[in-house]
Amino acid sequence: MKSELIFLPVPAFGHLVGMVEMAKLFISRHENLSVTVLISKFFIDTGIDNYNKSLLAKPTPRLTIINLPEIDPQKYLLKPRCAIFPSLIENQKTHVRDVMSRMTQSESTRVVGLLADILFVDIFDIADEFNVPTYVYSPAGAGFLGLAFHLQTLNDDKKQDVTEFRNSDTELLVPSFANPVPAEFLPSIFLEKDGRHDVLLSLYWRCREAKGIIVNTFEELEPYAINSLRMDSMIPPIYPVGPILNLNGEGQNSDEAAVILGWLDDQPPSSVVFLCFGSFGSFPENQVKEIAMGLERSGHRFLWSLRPCISEGETTLQLKYSNLELPAGFLDRTSCVGKVIGWAPQMAILAHEAVGGFVSHCGWNSVLESVWYGMPVATWPMYGEQQLNAFEMVKELGLAVEIEVDYRNEYNKSDFIVKADEIETKIKKLMMDGKNSKIRKKVKEMKEKSRVAMSENGSSYTSLAKLFEEIM
Protein backbone atom coordinates (compact mmCIF):
# COMPACT_ATOMS: atom_id res chain seq x y z
CA MET A 1 0.00 0.00 0.00
CA LYS A 2 1.25 3.46 -0.89
CA SER A 3 2.11 5.83 1.96
CA GLU A 4 0.91 9.40 1.63
CA LEU A 5 1.82 12.60 3.45
CA ILE A 6 -0.39 15.68 3.27
CA PHE A 7 1.45 19.02 3.31
CA LEU A 8 -0.33 22.24 4.21
CA PRO A 9 1.91 25.27 3.53
CA VAL A 10 1.15 28.88 4.32
CA PRO A 11 0.53 30.72 1.03
CA ALA A 12 3.42 33.14 1.38
CA PHE A 13 6.16 32.62 -1.17
CA GLY A 14 9.01 31.67 1.17
CA HIS A 15 6.80 29.33 3.21
CA LEU A 16 5.22 27.66 0.18
CA VAL A 17 8.45 27.12 -1.76
CA GLY A 18 10.16 25.62 1.27
CA MET A 19 7.44 23.03 1.80
CA VAL A 20 7.12 22.10 -1.88
CA GLU A 21 10.89 21.68 -2.20
CA MET A 22 10.81 19.60 0.97
CA ALA A 23 8.07 17.44 -0.55
CA LYS A 24 10.30 16.82 -3.57
CA LEU A 25 13.16 15.90 -1.23
CA PHE A 26 10.98 13.44 0.67
CA ILE A 27 9.85 11.77 -2.55
CA SER A 28 13.39 11.50 -3.87
CA ARG A 29 14.53 9.83 -0.66
CA HIS A 30 11.70 7.31 -0.20
CA GLU A 31 10.35 5.34 -3.17
CA ASN A 32 7.14 4.26 -1.41
CA LEU A 33 6.13 7.77 -0.37
CA SER A 34 3.83 10.22 -2.15
CA VAL A 35 3.00 13.76 -1.07
CA THR A 36 -0.15 15.81 -1.62
CA VAL A 37 0.28 19.57 -1.17
CA LEU A 38 -2.82 21.66 -0.44
CA ILE A 39 -2.35 25.24 -1.62
CA SER A 40 -4.51 28.22 -0.66
CA LYS A 41 -4.46 31.25 -2.92
CA PHE A 42 -3.24 34.30 -1.02
CA PHE A 43 -4.39 37.60 -2.44
CA ILE A 44 -1.23 39.58 -1.64
CA ASP A 45 1.68 37.50 -2.91
CA THR A 46 1.36 37.37 -6.70
CA GLY A 47 4.53 35.28 -6.95
CA ILE A 48 2.55 32.29 -5.68
CA ASP A 49 0.48 32.14 -8.88
CA ASN A 50 3.61 31.96 -11.03
CA TYR A 51 5.14 29.30 -8.82
CA ASN A 52 1.92 27.30 -8.78
CA LYS A 53 1.71 27.40 -12.58
CA SER A 54 5.31 26.21 -12.87
CA LEU A 55 4.51 23.22 -10.64
CA LEU A 56 1.51 22.26 -12.76
CA ALA A 57 3.46 22.75 -16.00
CA LYS A 58 6.24 20.39 -14.87
CA PRO A 59 4.61 17.66 -12.78
CA THR A 60 6.76 15.69 -10.36
CA PRO A 61 5.95 11.97 -10.05
CA ARG A 62 4.25 11.14 -6.74
CA LEU A 63 3.71 14.85 -5.98
CA THR A 64 0.08 16.01 -6.22
CA ILE A 65 -0.92 19.67 -6.04
CA ILE A 66 -4.46 20.48 -4.94
CA ASN A 67 -5.55 24.12 -5.08
CA LEU A 68 -8.06 24.90 -2.36
CA PRO A 69 -10.93 27.27 -3.21
CA GLU A 70 -10.06 30.95 -3.20
CA ILE A 71 -11.47 32.99 -0.33
CA ASP A 72 -12.73 36.57 -0.59
CA PRO A 73 -9.78 38.84 0.34
CA GLN A 74 -12.15 41.41 1.85
CA LYS A 75 -12.40 39.12 4.88
CA TYR A 76 -8.76 39.78 5.70
CA LEU A 77 -8.06 43.39 4.76
CA LEU A 78 -8.42 44.79 8.26
CA LYS A 79 -6.69 41.95 10.07
CA PRO A 80 -3.14 42.35 11.39
CA ARG A 81 -0.67 40.28 9.38
CA CYS A 82 -0.16 37.75 12.18
CA ALA A 83 -3.89 36.97 12.32
CA ILE A 84 -4.41 36.51 8.58
CA PHE A 85 -3.10 32.98 8.30
CA PRO A 86 -4.80 31.41 11.36
CA SER A 87 -8.04 32.99 10.11
CA LEU A 88 -7.38 31.74 6.58
CA ILE A 89 -6.96 28.14 7.67
CA GLU A 90 -10.11 28.36 9.78
CA ASN A 91 -12.01 29.18 6.58
CA GLN A 92 -10.32 26.29 4.74
CA LYS A 93 -11.04 23.61 7.34
CA THR A 94 -14.10 22.29 5.49
CA HIS A 95 -12.12 21.86 2.29
CA VAL A 96 -9.20 20.20 4.08
CA ARG A 97 -11.64 17.85 5.81
CA ASP A 98 -13.09 16.84 2.43
CA VAL A 99 -9.62 16.06 1.05
CA MET A 100 -8.61 14.06 4.11
CA SER A 101 -11.90 12.16 4.09
CA ARG A 102 -11.36 11.03 0.50
CA MET A 103 -7.73 10.10 1.07
CA THR A 104 -8.25 8.18 4.31
CA GLN A 105 -11.04 6.13 2.71
CA SER A 106 -8.85 5.05 -0.19
CA GLU A 107 -7.99 1.34 -0.22
CA SER A 108 -4.74 1.97 -2.07
CA THR A 109 -3.35 4.74 0.14
CA ARG A 110 -2.35 4.97 3.79
CA VAL A 111 -2.19 8.56 5.04
CA VAL A 112 0.82 8.51 7.37
CA GLY A 113 0.79 12.14 8.46
CA LEU A 114 -0.25 15.75 8.06
CA LEU A 115 2.60 18.25 7.96
CA ALA A 116 1.38 21.80 8.55
CA ASP A 117 3.22 25.10 8.50
CA ILE A 118 3.62 26.43 12.01
CA LEU A 119 1.06 29.17 11.27
CA PHE A 120 -1.52 26.53 10.26
CA VAL A 121 -1.35 24.23 13.29
CA ASP A 122 -5.02 24.83 14.10
CA ILE A 123 -5.70 22.36 11.29
CA PHE A 124 -4.63 19.65 13.75
CA ASP A 125 -8.31 19.50 14.77
CA ILE A 126 -9.17 18.04 11.37
CA ALA A 127 -6.28 15.56 11.40
CA ASP A 128 -7.42 14.36 14.82
CA GLU A 129 -10.87 13.54 13.40
CA PHE A 130 -9.20 10.99 11.10
CA ASN A 131 -6.53 9.81 13.58
CA VAL A 132 -3.81 11.12 11.28
CA PRO A 133 -0.49 11.92 13.03
CA THR A 134 0.50 15.59 12.92
CA TYR A 135 3.85 17.23 12.27
CA VAL A 136 4.95 20.86 12.13
CA TYR A 137 7.13 22.60 9.56
CA SER A 138 9.12 25.59 10.82
CA PRO A 139 10.33 27.81 7.96
CA ALA A 140 12.26 29.88 10.51
CA GLY A 141 15.49 28.80 12.15
CA ALA A 142 16.03 26.84 15.35
CA GLY A 143 17.09 29.97 17.24
CA PHE A 144 13.77 31.70 16.59
CA LEU A 145 11.84 28.51 17.28
CA GLY A 146 13.49 28.27 20.69
CA LEU A 147 12.69 31.92 21.44
CA ALA A 148 9.03 31.42 20.53
CA PHE A 149 8.72 28.41 22.83
CA HIS A 150 10.50 30.36 25.58
CA LEU A 151 8.11 33.32 25.31
CA GLN A 152 5.12 30.98 25.18
CA THR A 153 6.32 29.35 28.41
CA LEU A 154 6.82 32.73 30.09
CA ASN A 155 3.36 33.86 28.97
CA ASP A 156 1.34 30.72 29.73
CA ASP A 157 3.17 28.90 32.52
CA LYS A 158 4.87 31.71 34.40
CA LYS A 159 2.10 34.27 33.74
CA GLN A 160 4.58 36.90 32.64
CA ASP A 161 3.29 39.61 30.32
CA VAL A 162 5.83 39.39 27.50
CA THR A 163 4.52 42.61 25.93
CA GLU A 164 6.28 44.45 28.77
CA PHE A 165 9.56 43.76 26.97
CA ARG A 166 8.63 46.45 24.42
CA ASN A 167 11.01 49.43 24.72
CA SER A 168 12.80 47.60 27.53
CA ASP A 169 16.56 47.39 28.01
CA THR A 170 16.16 43.87 29.44
CA GLU A 171 18.40 41.09 28.20
CA LEU A 172 16.71 37.69 28.05
CA LEU A 173 18.39 34.38 28.77
CA VAL A 174 16.89 32.32 25.95
CA PRO A 175 17.79 28.60 25.92
CA SER A 176 18.36 28.58 22.15
CA PHE A 177 20.93 31.40 22.25
CA ALA A 178 24.40 31.28 23.76
CA ASN A 179 24.38 35.06 24.23
CA PRO A 180 21.78 37.08 26.16
CA VAL A 181 19.16 38.43 23.74
CA PRO A 182 18.39 42.14 24.18
CA ALA A 183 14.65 42.81 24.17
CA GLU A 184 15.10 45.21 21.24
CA PHE A 185 15.68 42.18 18.98
CA LEU A 186 12.42 40.45 19.87
CA PRO A 187 9.92 40.26 16.99
CA SER A 188 7.36 43.07 17.23
CA ILE A 189 4.47 40.64 16.95
CA PHE A 190 5.29 39.17 20.37
CA LEU A 191 5.17 42.63 21.94
CA GLU A 192 1.84 43.99 20.68
CA LYS A 193 -0.60 44.81 23.48
CA ASP A 194 -3.67 44.46 21.23
CA GLY A 195 -3.78 40.68 21.63
CA ARG A 196 -1.72 39.83 18.56
CA HIS A 197 0.94 38.16 20.69
CA ASP A 198 -1.67 35.80 22.13
CA VAL A 199 -2.61 34.69 18.61
CA LEU A 200 0.97 33.78 17.79
CA LEU A 201 1.92 32.26 21.13
CA SER A 202 -1.14 30.02 21.03
CA LEU A 203 0.23 28.46 17.83
CA TYR A 204 3.43 27.45 19.61
CA TRP A 205 1.39 25.97 22.42
CA ARG A 206 -0.38 23.80 19.84
CA CYS A 207 2.95 22.84 18.28
CA ARG A 208 3.66 20.84 21.41
CA GLU A 209 0.89 18.40 20.35
CA ALA A 210 2.78 17.37 17.21
CA LYS A 211 4.78 14.16 16.82
CA GLY A 212 7.73 16.11 15.45
CA ILE A 213 8.93 19.49 14.20
CA ILE A 214 10.77 19.69 10.89
CA VAL A 215 13.07 22.73 10.74
CA ASN A 216 14.69 24.27 7.67
CA THR A 217 18.17 24.49 9.15
CA PHE A 218 21.15 22.21 9.69
CA GLU A 219 23.19 21.05 12.67
CA GLU A 220 26.42 22.80 11.69
CA LEU A 221 24.72 26.19 11.33
CA GLU A 222 22.75 26.22 14.60
CA PRO A 223 24.23 23.53 16.87
CA TYR A 224 23.54 25.40 20.11
CA ALA A 225 19.90 26.14 19.28
CA ILE A 226 19.15 22.64 17.97
CA ASN A 227 20.67 21.00 21.04
CA SER A 228 18.67 23.24 23.38
CA LEU A 229 15.42 22.25 21.66
CA ARG A 230 16.29 18.57 21.91
CA MET A 231 17.09 18.92 25.61
CA ASP A 232 13.58 20.26 26.37
CA SER A 233 11.28 17.32 27.12
CA MET A 234 8.21 19.51 26.55
CA ILE A 235 9.11 20.12 22.89
CA PRO A 236 8.44 17.41 20.26
CA PRO A 237 11.41 15.77 18.51
CA ILE A 238 13.30 18.18 16.25
CA TYR A 239 14.36 17.20 12.72
CA PRO A 240 16.71 19.70 11.02
CA VAL A 241 16.60 18.73 7.33
CA GLY A 242 17.89 21.86 5.57
CA PRO A 243 18.96 23.90 3.88
CA ILE A 244 15.91 23.36 1.66
CA LEU A 245 16.09 25.83 -1.24
CA ASN A 246 14.48 26.47 -4.61
CA LEU A 247 17.72 25.77 -6.46
CA ASN A 248 16.06 25.43 -9.87
CA GLY A 249 14.26 28.76 -9.66
CA GLU A 250 10.71 27.54 -10.41
CA GLY A 251 8.18 30.34 -10.68
CA GLN A 252 10.65 32.99 -11.81
CA ASN A 253 10.13 35.35 -14.72
CA SER A 254 12.72 33.96 -17.12
CA ASP A 255 12.74 37.01 -19.41
CA GLU A 256 13.42 39.45 -16.57
CA ALA A 257 15.96 37.09 -15.05
CA ALA A 258 17.84 36.88 -18.34
CA VAL A 259 18.19 40.67 -18.52
CA ILE A 260 19.44 40.91 -14.93
CA LEU A 261 21.89 38.03 -15.25
CA GLY A 262 23.09 39.40 -18.58
CA TRP A 263 23.99 42.66 -16.85
CA LEU A 264 25.88 40.73 -14.16
CA ASP A 265 27.78 38.84 -16.86
CA ASP A 266 29.38 42.14 -17.85
CA GLN A 267 30.64 42.95 -14.32
CA PRO A 268 34.01 41.92 -12.82
CA PRO A 269 34.10 39.02 -10.32
CA SER A 270 32.97 39.82 -6.76
CA SER A 271 32.48 43.50 -7.64
CA VAL A 272 28.71 43.92 -7.18
CA VAL A 273 26.82 44.48 -3.94
CA PHE A 274 23.30 43.08 -4.17
CA LEU A 275 20.51 44.73 -2.14
CA CYS A 276 17.24 42.85 -1.67
CA PHE A 277 14.73 43.07 1.18
CA GLY A 278 12.14 40.37 0.52
CA SER A 279 8.55 40.37 -0.71
CA PHE A 280 7.39 42.95 1.83
CA GLY A 281 10.69 44.82 1.97
CA SER A 282 9.89 48.36 0.93
CA PHE A 283 10.97 51.73 2.31
CA PRO A 284 9.46 55.21 2.56
CA GLU A 285 10.72 57.70 0.00
CA ASN A 286 13.13 59.50 2.34
CA GLN A 287 14.87 56.21 3.21
CA VAL A 288 15.06 55.23 -0.48
CA LYS A 289 16.91 58.47 -1.17
CA GLU A 290 19.39 57.82 1.65
CA ILE A 291 20.11 54.33 0.30
CA ALA A 292 20.65 55.75 -3.18
CA MET A 293 23.06 58.39 -1.90
CA GLY A 294 24.95 55.84 0.20
CA LEU A 295 25.32 53.51 -2.78
CA GLU A 296 26.51 56.28 -5.06
CA ARG A 297 29.05 57.56 -2.55
CA SER A 298 30.40 54.06 -1.87
CA GLY A 299 31.69 53.86 -5.43
CA HIS A 300 30.81 50.17 -5.64
CA ARG A 301 28.88 48.47 -8.39
CA PHE A 302 25.39 47.57 -7.23
CA LEU A 303 22.23 45.67 -8.11
CA TRP A 304 19.29 47.00 -6.09
CA SER A 305 15.89 45.31 -5.86
CA LEU A 306 13.54 48.18 -5.00
CA ARG A 307 9.87 47.60 -4.20
CA PRO A 308 7.08 50.17 -3.81
CA CYS A 309 5.57 50.56 -0.37
CA ILE A 310 2.68 48.33 0.63
CA SER A 311 0.23 49.67 3.18
CA GLU A 312 -1.84 47.77 5.71
CA GLY A 313 -4.98 46.64 3.90
CA GLU A 314 -3.53 46.49 0.39
CA THR A 315 -4.33 43.31 -1.51
CA THR A 316 -1.47 42.96 -3.99
CA LEU A 317 2.31 43.22 -3.81
CA GLN A 318 3.77 45.48 -6.47
CA LEU A 319 6.93 44.23 -8.15
CA LYS A 320 8.02 47.44 -9.91
CA TYR A 321 9.60 50.53 -8.40
CA SER A 322 8.91 54.16 -9.31
CA ASN A 323 11.71 56.42 -10.54
CA LEU A 324 10.07 59.23 -8.58
CA GLU A 325 11.36 57.69 -5.34
CA LEU A 326 15.00 58.09 -6.41
CA PRO A 327 17.13 61.26 -6.20
CA ALA A 328 17.10 63.40 -9.34
CA GLY A 329 19.68 62.16 -11.84
CA PHE A 330 20.62 59.08 -9.79
CA LEU A 331 19.95 56.56 -12.55
CA ASP A 332 21.91 58.59 -15.10
CA ARG A 333 24.90 59.13 -12.81
CA THR A 334 25.13 55.46 -11.84
CA SER A 335 24.19 53.89 -15.18
CA CYS A 336 27.71 52.53 -15.74
CA VAL A 337 28.05 50.87 -12.33
CA GLY A 338 24.57 50.12 -11.05
CA LYS A 339 21.20 48.67 -11.93
CA VAL A 340 17.89 49.22 -10.12
CA ILE A 341 15.29 46.49 -10.57
CA GLY A 342 11.94 45.46 -9.11
CA TRP A 343 11.55 41.72 -8.74
CA ALA A 344 14.84 39.81 -8.41
CA PRO A 345 15.80 36.17 -9.12
CA GLN A 346 17.65 36.10 -5.80
CA MET A 347 19.11 32.59 -5.92
CA ALA A 348 20.54 33.08 -9.41
CA ILE A 349 22.00 36.44 -8.41
CA LEU A 350 23.68 35.10 -5.28
CA ALA A 351 25.14 32.27 -7.35
CA HIS A 352 26.68 34.68 -9.88
CA GLU A 353 30.43 35.21 -9.68
CA ALA A 354 30.06 38.98 -10.13
CA VAL A 355 28.29 39.36 -6.77
CA GLY A 356 30.57 39.94 -3.78
CA GLY A 357 28.19 41.01 -1.01
CA PHE A 358 24.53 40.89 -0.04
CA VAL A 359 22.58 43.58 1.86
CA SER A 360 19.64 41.55 3.18
CA HIS A 361 16.53 41.84 5.32
CA CYS A 362 17.58 38.53 6.90
CA GLY A 363 14.48 36.53 6.19
CA TRP A 364 15.43 32.96 7.04
CA ASN A 365 15.31 31.76 3.43
CA SER A 366 17.71 34.56 2.49
CA VAL A 367 20.00 33.58 5.35
CA LEU A 368 20.12 30.00 4.08
CA GLU A 369 20.63 31.10 0.49
CA SER A 370 23.54 33.35 1.47
CA VAL A 371 25.12 30.48 3.39
CA TRP A 372 24.60 28.01 0.51
CA TYR A 373 26.46 30.30 -1.87
CA GLY A 374 29.05 31.51 0.66
CA MET A 375 27.91 35.12 0.33
CA PRO A 376 28.87 37.65 3.05
CA VAL A 377 25.84 39.56 4.35
CA ALA A 378 25.22 43.04 5.70
CA THR A 379 22.07 42.88 7.83
CA TRP A 380 19.13 45.26 7.46
CA PRO A 381 16.10 43.54 9.04
CA MET A 382 12.61 44.87 8.39
CA TYR A 383 9.82 42.92 10.09
CA GLY A 384 8.80 39.56 11.56
CA GLU A 385 11.66 37.60 13.11
CA GLN A 386 14.29 39.31 10.97
CA GLN A 387 15.78 41.38 13.81
CA LEU A 388 16.43 38.16 15.71
CA ASN A 389 17.90 36.52 12.60
CA ALA A 390 20.22 39.50 12.18
CA PHE A 391 21.29 39.24 15.82
CA GLU A 392 21.99 35.54 15.33
CA MET A 393 23.97 36.07 12.12
CA VAL A 394 26.10 38.88 13.58
CA LYS A 395 26.45 38.08 17.29
CA GLU A 396 25.91 34.32 17.58
CA LEU A 397 27.35 32.96 14.36
CA GLY A 398 29.75 35.66 13.15
CA LEU A 399 28.54 35.27 9.56
CA ALA A 400 27.50 38.87 8.85
CA VAL A 401 28.26 42.53 9.40
CA GLU A 402 25.54 44.93 10.39
CA ILE A 403 24.12 47.98 8.71
CA GLU A 404 21.32 47.79 11.24
CA VAL A 405 20.32 44.82 13.36
CA ASP A 406 17.25 46.25 15.10
CA TYR A 407 15.69 48.39 12.34
CA ARG A 408 11.90 47.95 12.12
CA ASN A 409 9.60 48.98 9.31
CA GLU A 410 6.20 47.34 9.68
CA TYR A 411 4.01 48.69 6.86
CA ASN A 412 6.48 51.56 6.35
CA LYS A 413 5.59 53.12 9.69
CA SER A 414 9.20 53.59 10.81
CA ASP A 415 10.28 57.12 11.73
CA PHE A 416 13.92 56.04 11.97
CA ILE A 417 16.07 56.78 8.94
CA VAL A 418 19.44 55.15 8.31
CA LYS A 419 21.61 57.91 6.89
CA ALA A 420 23.60 57.76 3.67
CA ASP A 421 26.94 58.12 5.48
CA GLU A 422 26.31 54.99 7.54
CA ILE A 423 25.11 53.04 4.51
CA GLU A 424 28.21 54.10 2.56
CA THR A 425 30.54 53.04 5.40
CA LYS A 426 28.92 49.63 5.91
CA ILE A 427 28.82 48.81 2.20
CA LYS A 428 32.52 49.63 1.94
CA LYS A 429 33.19 47.39 4.93
CA LEU A 430 31.19 44.55 3.38
CA MET A 431 32.87 44.83 -0.01
CA MET A 432 36.42 45.91 0.83
CA ASP A 433 37.39 43.51 3.63
CA GLY A 434 38.93 41.30 0.98
CA LYS A 435 38.96 37.58 0.37
CA ASN A 436 40.84 36.89 3.58
CA SER A 437 38.47 38.62 6.00
CA LYS A 438 37.31 36.61 9.01
CA ILE A 439 33.64 36.75 8.02
CA ARG A 440 34.31 35.74 4.42
CA LYS A 441 36.33 32.76 5.62
CA LYS A 442 33.59 31.66 8.02
CA VAL A 443 30.89 32.03 5.36
CA LYS A 444 32.91 29.98 2.87
CA GLU A 445 33.43 27.27 5.49
CA MET A 446 29.70 27.23 6.27
CA LYS A 447 28.95 26.95 2.55
CA GLU A 448 30.86 23.68 2.44
CA LYS A 449 29.19 22.44 5.63
CA SER A 450 25.74 23.20 4.22
CA ARG A 451 26.40 21.01 1.21
CA VAL A 452 27.88 18.20 3.26
CA ALA A 453 24.79 18.31 5.51
CA MET A 454 22.53 17.51 2.54
CA SER A 455 24.76 14.81 1.07
CA GLU A 456 24.63 11.11 1.92
CA ASN A 457 25.36 10.51 5.63
CA GLY A 458 25.41 14.27 6.27
CA SER A 459 23.60 15.65 9.32
CA SER A 460 20.40 16.66 7.50
CA TYR A 461 20.42 13.48 5.41
CA THR A 462 20.60 11.43 8.61
CA SER A 463 17.95 13.53 10.35
CA LEU A 464 15.53 12.94 7.48
CA ALA A 465 16.19 9.19 7.66
CA LYS A 466 15.22 9.28 11.36
CA LEU A 467 12.04 11.17 10.46
CA PHE A 468 11.12 8.49 7.92
CA GLU A 469 11.57 5.84 10.61
CA GLU A 470 9.05 7.73 12.75
CA ILE A 471 6.55 8.41 9.96
CA MET A 472 6.59 5.11 8.07
Swiss-Prot record:
Keywords: Glycosyltransferase, Hydrolase, Isoprene biosynthesis, Transferase. The active site is at 15 (proton acceptor), 117 (charge relay). The keyword Transferase applies. It is an enzyme of class 2 (transferase). Pathway: Secondary metabolite biosynthesis; terpenoid biosynthesis. The record marks 142, 186, 338 as: Essential for the glycosylation activity toward the C6-OH of protopanaxatriol (PPT). Its EC number is 2.4.1.367. Pfam families: UDPGT (PF00201). An anthocyanidin binds at residues 15, 384. GO terms for biological process: response to molecule of fungal origin; terpenoid biosynthetic process. It catalyses: (20S)-protopanaxadiol + UDP-alpha-D-glucose = (20S)-ginsenoside C-K + UDP + H(+); (20S)-protopanaxatriol + UDP-alpha-D-glucose = (20S)-ginsenoside Rh1 + UDP + H(+); (20S)-ginsenoside F1 + UDP-alpha-D-glucose = (20S)-ginsenoside Rg1 + UDP + H(+). GO terms for molecular function: hydrolase activity; UDP-glucosyltransferase activity. Induction: Induced by A.niger mycelium-derived elicitor, thus improving ginsenosides production in adventitious roots culture. UDP-alpha-D-glucose binds at residues 344, 346, 361, 364-366, 369, 385-386. Gene3D superfamilies: Glycogen Phosphorylase B (3.40.50.2000). Belongs to the UDP-glycosyltransferase family. Component of the dammarane-type triterpene saponins (e.g. PPT-type ginsenosides or panaxosides) biosynthetic pathway. Glycosyltransferase that catalyzes the biosynthesis of ginsenoside Rh1 from protopanaxatriol (PPT) and the conversion of ginsenoside F1 to ginsenoside Rg1. This is UDP-glycosyltransferase 100. It comes from Panax ginseng. The gene is UGT100.
